[in-house]
């Protein structure tokens, strides 16, 4: 400011710099200040700092004041400052800032409101430098809580760490606290750093600076069906006054408290639901707790309803709640004693087994182990199972009746080779080697008896390796294997040409059947031919007593084909190609079947080793194996066919020409006949034309008269025909009506006759019934009784009249008939019933 005269209002101030001494001083208004030449006004008049009520400000580098409150000046006249320090000033008279003093502006506010601490709130403060308060020395680092409600008076030596709100503790809740340092809490309990405890007092709780709120713990509501399982973190005494060891587990139930709040050194393991059992339920508890509260590990306890209980710690129910075993009439339980056991039936040693048969209810005991719940196995007439006696090791088959395993019996599984299993599941017990399934898995129940349906006209050989004897079953039949029996598997040749082991089969087809084979032969002139042969065969066996030699040749197809091929090759080798080609069937038949005494070919070929008979052989094809020979043969055949075809064409052409010549001769002759007929027809036409001209000359009147006469004749004939048709129709209608009337009358007559017969039969039956009724009544009442009843009325009336002294009287005329039957009734006045 350059003005020499400065007007300073009230509560305003300026700083004047003395340029000679370099000292700055403060001048407060109201005053008019005349600036000297060596003085400089540093700024325009500024308002003094005004702190309203409930406010404060922070002055940095405050000036030093003496005990009287006056500003202390240095020797140079400069205001003495506490550099680096700060001073908090509250409400009062406005004051100027001396040179060097500064207002601490926080959030652009130099004057701030005093902080109000509401209820249930506190300020966590920390001493940043030592100071003395109410004769008490507060050292740096000390922390404390300023609780509300109040206004917080700040100090430069104290810093606010945070605002802390109280935690409200509701019913069934508690506050978990942890000590930060060693201290004595509000209840006078000494706490060490890291210790945890619960505050259960209801209401708002404001923690001290030595405490940390860990969490607010909700209580667990307990009921008759709900308990709380706890575990001790360390050894302590719980809220119920019981000493707990570290790691110990226990349960709190409704008997202890309706609500439980997990303590600081307790851990909630789980909420345990009560186990409720009805009269038909039970549980097996493992590791039960004894009366002292300790688990008996390795033991079990059976509890049966009706009851409700909680599982104690370490107790388990691996199988859960189980229904009481209801053993039916056709059921049983296989039991085994795990230790010495006494029941109503006697004493059982450990390891002994016995059966409990139904009907009954059974609950396993601790000393007994339930091995199996057995039922009667219903078996049809063609079903069975294998049963093994565990005592003797004997295996037997049970077939066709319901069976219950005994205590020393088990189902025995009969294992068969995988190849036989696959054959059993094939439709006819046969399968080709190329069709086998490498991943085949048998679905047969091993303990079920092995069954196989032998087809019609087939046989199966079964070998008992215990008795070393085979047996043969002829079809149709159902084979059931005994425990020590096995199937005889046939491995047959197949394909064309035959390949060994191409097919496996459980049954031997007895035939008649046929087989085909391809063989290569060579004639005497070294012509190689491929023959395709087919032959019929069957097994000649005695069905009443089949022989075991039928199965003596495992591959009878292969042996038969080899034998036939050998004979055919030998026979063909003795013939040249032309001779064999002309007589192939005869040569092969004689070679295979042979000849009898008279030189004729036999009818069959018999293999005595297995009673195998070949009845017929057929050559399906014969062709050279050499390609050139085959082509030459085909060319010769084609040439022969062409020659035959050409000769047939020439004969047909000659016959056709002969027929054409004959047809031409017939045609010429017919033309001449037609000309003669035409001339005759022309002659007749000329004659008719002449007659026509004569008729025309006779005049038109004759023609018209003839036409009218013919028309009249036609009309009369038409009317006559119509009259005949009407008469015929009337006659047909009358006959139909008459026939209809006759049929109706016949039906009515038949109906009337049947109705009369029914009425007569009904009347006869009613009369017979009435007569029978009367007869039975008479028989029931008796003859003497009827006579007495008939006489009782008249006798009584006579006696009555006699007692009155009347002899009787009657007045009548000759025209009125007299009925004296009821005269007595009329006289005595008795009503007629």
Swiss-Prot record:
Q: Which InterPro entries match?
A: Band_7/SPFH_dom_sf, MVP, MVP_rep_dom, MVP_rep_sf, MVP_shoulder, Vault_2, Vault_2_sf, Vault_3
Localization of this protein: Cytoplasm; Nucleus
The highest taxon in the source lineage is: Eukaryota
Q: Name one GO cellular component term.
A: cytoplasm
Which terms are listed as keywords in the entry?
Cytoplasm, Nucleus, Phosphoprotein, Repeat, Ribonucleoprotein
Q: How does it assemble?
A: The vault ribonucleoprotein particle is a huge (400 A x 670 A) cage structure of 12.9 MDa. It consists of a dimer of half-vaults, with each half-vault comprising 39 identical major vault protein (MVP) chains, PARP4 and one or more vault RNAs (vRNAs).
Name of this protein: Major vault protein
Q: Species name for this entry?
A: Leishmania braziliensis
Taxon lineage: Eukaryota, Discoba, Euglenozoa, Kinetoplastea, Metakinetoplastina
């Amino acid at each position: 400011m350059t003005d020499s005269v400065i007007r300073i209002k009230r509560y305003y101030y300026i700083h004047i710099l003395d340029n000679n001494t370099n000292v700055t001083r403060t001048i407060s208004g109201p005053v008019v200040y005349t600036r000297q030449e060596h003085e400089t006004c540093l700024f325009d008049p500024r308002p003094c700092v005004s702190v309203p009520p409930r406010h404060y400000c922070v002055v940095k580098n405050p000036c030093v004041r003496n005990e009287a409150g006056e500003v202390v000046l240095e020797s140079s006249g400069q205001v003495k400052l506490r550099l680096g320090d700060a001073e908090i000033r509250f409400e009062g008279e406005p004051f100027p800032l001396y040179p060097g003093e500064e207002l601490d502006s926080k959030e652009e506010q130099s004057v701030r409101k005093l902080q109000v601490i509401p209820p249930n709130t506190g300020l966590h403060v920390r001493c940043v430098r030592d100071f003395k308060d109410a004769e008490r020395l507060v050292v740096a680092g000390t922390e404390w809580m300023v609780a509300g409600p109040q206004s917080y008076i700040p100090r430069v030596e104290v810093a606010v760490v945070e605002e802390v709100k109280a935690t409200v503790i509701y019913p069934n809740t508690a506050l978990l606290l942890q000590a930060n340092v060693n201290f004595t809490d509000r209840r006078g309990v000494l706490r060490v750093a890291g210790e945890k405890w619960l505050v259960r007092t209801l209401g708002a709780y404001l923690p001290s600076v030595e405490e940390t709120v860990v969490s607010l713990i909700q209580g667990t509501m307990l009921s008759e069906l709900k308990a709380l399982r706890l575990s001790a973190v360390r050894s302590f005494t719980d809220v119920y006054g019981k000493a707990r060891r570290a790691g110990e587990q226990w349960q709190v139930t409704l008997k202890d408290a309706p609500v439980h709040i997990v303590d600081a050194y307790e851990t909630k393991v789980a909420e345990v639901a009560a186990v409720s059992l009805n009269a038909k339920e039970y549980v097996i508890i493992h590791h039960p707790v004894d009366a002292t509260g300790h688990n008996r590990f390795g033991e079990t306890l059976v509890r049966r309803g009706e009851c409700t209980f909680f599982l104690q710690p370490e107790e388990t129910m691996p199988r859960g709640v189980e229904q009481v075993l209801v053993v039916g009439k056709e059921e049983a339980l296989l039991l085994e004693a795990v230790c010495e056991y006494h029941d109503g039936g006697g004493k059982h040693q450990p390891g002994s087994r016995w059966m409990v048969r139904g009907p009954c209810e059974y609950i396993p005991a601790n000393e007994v182990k339930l091995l199996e719940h057995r039922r009667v196995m219903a078996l049809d007439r063609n079903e069975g199972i294998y049963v093994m006696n565990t005592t003797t090791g004997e295996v037997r088959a049970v077939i066709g009746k319901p069976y219950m395993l005994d205590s020393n019996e088990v189902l025995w599984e009969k294992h068969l080779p995988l190849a036989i299993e696959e054959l059993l599941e094939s439709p006819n017990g046969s399968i080709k080697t190329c069709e086998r399934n490498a991943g085949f898995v048998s679905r047969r129940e091993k303990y079920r008896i092995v069954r196989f349906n032998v087809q019609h006209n087939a046989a199966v050989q079964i070998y008992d390796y215990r008795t070393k004897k085979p047996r043969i079953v002829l079809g149709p039949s159902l084979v059931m294997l005994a425990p020590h029996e096995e199937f005889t598997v046939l491995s047959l040749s197949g394909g064309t040409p035959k390949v060994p082991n191409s097919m496996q089969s459980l049954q031997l087809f007895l035939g008649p059947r046929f087989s085909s084979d391809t063989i290569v032969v060579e004639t005497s002139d070294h012509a190689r031919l491929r023959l395709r042969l087919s032959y019929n065969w069957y097994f000649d066996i005695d069905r009443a007593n089949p022989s075991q030699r039928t199965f003596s040749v495992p591959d009878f197809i292969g042996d038969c084909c080899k034998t036939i091929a050998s004979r055919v090759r030998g026979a063909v080798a003795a013939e040249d190609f032309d001779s064999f080609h002309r007589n192939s069937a005869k040569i092969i038949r004689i070679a295979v079947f042979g000849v009898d005494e008279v030189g004729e070919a036999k009818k069959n070929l018999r293999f005595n080793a297995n009673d195998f008979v070949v009845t017929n052989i057929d050559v399906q094809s014969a062709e050279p194996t050499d390609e050139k020979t085959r082509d030459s043969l085909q060319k010769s055949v084609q040439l022969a066919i062409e020659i035959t075809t050409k000769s047939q064409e020439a004969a047909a052409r000659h016959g056709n020409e002969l027929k054409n010549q004959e047809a031409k001769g017939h045609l010429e002759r017919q033309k001449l006949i037609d000309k003669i007929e035409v001339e005759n027809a022309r002659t007749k036409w000329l004659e008719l034309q002449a007659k026509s001209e004569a008729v025309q000359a006779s005049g038109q009147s004759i023609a018209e008269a003839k036409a009218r006469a013919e028309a009249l004749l036609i009309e009369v004939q038409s009317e006559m025909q119509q009259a005949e048709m009407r008469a015929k129709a009337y006659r047909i209608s009358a006959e139909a009506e008459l026939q209809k009337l006759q049929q109706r009358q016949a039906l009515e007559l038949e109906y009337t006759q049947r109705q009369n017969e029914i009425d007569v039969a009904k009347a006869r039956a009613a009369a017979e019934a009435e007569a029978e009724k009367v007869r039975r009544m008479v028989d029931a009442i008796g003859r003497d009784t009827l006579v007495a009843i008939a006489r009782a009325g008249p006798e009584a009336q006579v006696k009555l009249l006699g007692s009155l002294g009347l002899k009787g009287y009657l007045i009548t005329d000759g025209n009125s008939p007299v009925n004296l039957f009821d005269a007595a009734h009329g006289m005595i006045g008795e009503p007629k019933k």
